[in-house]
Design a protein with these regions (language model features):
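Phosphate-/nucleic-acid-contacting segments
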Residues: 143-195
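Cyclic-nucleotide recognition modules
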Residues: 66-123
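Cyclic nucleotide-binding regulatory module and flanking cytosolic helices
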Residues: 1-30, 81
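Glycine- and acidic-residue-biased ligand/ion/polar-headgroup-sensing regions
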Residues: 32, 43-54, 72-73
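Short beta-strand segments in beta-sandwich/barrel cores
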Residues: 25, 34, 52-57, 75, ...
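Hydrophobic/aromatic-rich structural module bridging two neighboring secondary-structure elements via a short loop
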Residues: 59-65
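Short, Lys/Arg-enriched N-terminal segment that forms or immediately precedes the first helix
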Residues: 129-139
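Short phosphate-coordinating micro-motif centered on Lys-Gly-acidic
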Residues: 35-40
Length: 195
């Protein structure tokens, strides 16, 4: 299992998001800055108010491999490495200027320990992490790049306005030229269906 943690709005984590916004430090993040770097022992969690991030690592040939994208109203953290006292394996890097609310995970410990539903929130974290990692594994192993492209388009309709083609290509597992051909093909298909 990878070490990046992406908590989406699919699960009911609204109370936790509100808590992070209340007690977290509001930070302006510039394009290219890292929220976390591979090798760090982190222990941070953040709510994304504005902007987009990528979980990325370079392979042995120096090519960027993108594991995930995160956008507004999502949480990012290094919960699993932190709990296991392990270094982070991926960079979480801003793809555009943004605003996050960030707090050390340790600052939320009292909430988890005193809140009646605190254990439920931790369980939801872990379940959400596990399910998202499984989704990504299944996607990479079982889906074609075209299917991954369609799923990404559905999740983030404005992805091509926010993320460069090279990063999208790395995420779906193709070269940028192949992505351009795929995109052109899908656009032609859409225009043919709409006429």
């Amino acid at each position: 299992m990878s070490d990046f943690d992406i908590y989406t709005s699919e699960s009911d984590l609204s109370q936790l998001k509100d808590l992070i916004k209340q007690c977290g430090e509001r930070l302006v993040i510039r394009k290219g800055e890292c929220f976390l770097r591979a090798g760090e022992i982190g222990g941070k969690i953040a709510y994304i108010e504005q902007g987009g991030f990528k979980c990325v690592r370079k392979d042995s040939r120096g090519n960027e491999r993108i594991f995930a994208f995160m956008f507004e109203d999502e949480l990012i953290a290094d919960y699993i490495p932190y709990r296991n006292k392990k270094p982070v394996l991926l960079d979480i890097q801003a793809m555009e200027d943004g605003v996050i609310y960030c707090t050390p995970i340790e600052n939320l410990r009292s909430f988890f320990e005193t809140e009646i539903d605190g254990d439920i929130y931790v369980r939801k974290f872990v379940e959400t992490i596990a399910y998202q990692h499984l989704q990504r594994i299944v996607s990479v192993v079982c889906e074609t790049p075209e299917e991954r492209y369609i799923q990404l388009q559905k999740r983030v309709p404005d992805i091509f306005y926010r993320v460069n083609l090279k990063d999208i290509a790395a995420y779906i597992g193709v070269r940028p030229e192949t992505l351009s051909r795929m995109r052109t093909s899908f656009l032609r298909k859409d225009s043919t269906e709409n006429t």
